[in-house]
Amino acid sequence: MFFSAALRARAAGLTAQWGRHVRNLHKTAMQNGAGGALFVHRDTPENNPDTPFDFTPENYKRIEAIVKNYPEGHKAAAVLPVLDLAQRQNGWLPISAMNKVAEVLQVPPMRVYEVATFYTMYNRKPVGKYHIQVCTTTPCMLRNSDSILEAIQKKLGIKVGETTPDKLFTLIEVECLGACVNAPMVQINDNYYEDLTAKDIEEIIDELKAGKIPKPGPRSGRFSCEPAGGLTSLTEPPKGPGFGVQAGL
């Protein structure tokens, strides 16, 4: 009994000590509306079952092509790509768009809701033209992603989870985007911008404001994800076909 109490006391002390350094892992979904507060939908004037939404004729053709990728009778497997298509058409996913996806794929609406509320890539509230997603998990944090986040907030005059008054930029924090070797990095719409400094992200924002699309990828001079100090192997052009093969072969 005493041992358990001691453990609980120690755990409480560690929590208090480190709590100010630990980010709330659930808040990403809360901030970008991917799940909304407690993943609950509440009708609003701009987001309710009567909000106008229908796929364009071109997108109906795309849906037909998507569904053909899956076995007959398994349209439900296409929920993710068709939700993505709806979001790309509309900019975000109102409940009416989810209902349309369910109708087109002939699945219960709940099967669509559970997907749309699970993945943070689906936006359940409007976002700006440029959706800035800053990775702040461990590798990026160790590479000073906080300075990138602060630079964006200062440059745009908004906080995490907010959109600029001109509807041009929305800023959120996200969990790992899978480009840890190029930390710190951000995703803006579909593009990755890596090996960033505060100055880099300010320049990227300036280009976007000017109507340009900055070149994606590392900003440090690296081609891809090779070692920052230069190649340590495969430093010469590859040999041609047959190199090193025994003469008898």
Curated annotation (Swiss-Prot):
Pfam families referenced in this protein's UniProt entry, alphabetically: 2Fe-2S_thioredx
Protein name, entry field: NADH dehydrogenase [ubiquinone] flavoprotein 2, mitochondrial
Quaternary structure note: Core subunit of respiratory chain NADH dehydrogenase (Complex I) which is composed of 45 different subunits. This is a component of the flavoprotein-sulfur (FP) fragment of the enzyme.
Chain spans, region Disordered: 213-249
The family this protein is said to belong to: Belongs to the complex I 24 kDa subunit family.
Subcellular location: Mitochondrion inner membrane
Residues that coordinate or bind [2Fe-2S] cluster: 135, 140, 176, 180
The species this protein was found in: Gorilla gorilla gorilla (Western lowland gorilla)
Domain of life: Eukaryota
Residue list for modification Phosphotyrosine: 193
Function: Core subunit of the mitochondrial membrane respiratory chain NADH dehydrogenase (Complex I) which catalyzes electron transfer from NADH through the respiratory chain, using ubiquinone as an electron acceptor. Parts of the peripheral arm of the enzyme, where the electrons from NADH are accepted by flavin mononucleotide (FMN) and then passed along a chain of iron-sulfur clusters by electron tunnelling to the final acceptor ubiquinone. Contains one iron-sulfur cluster.
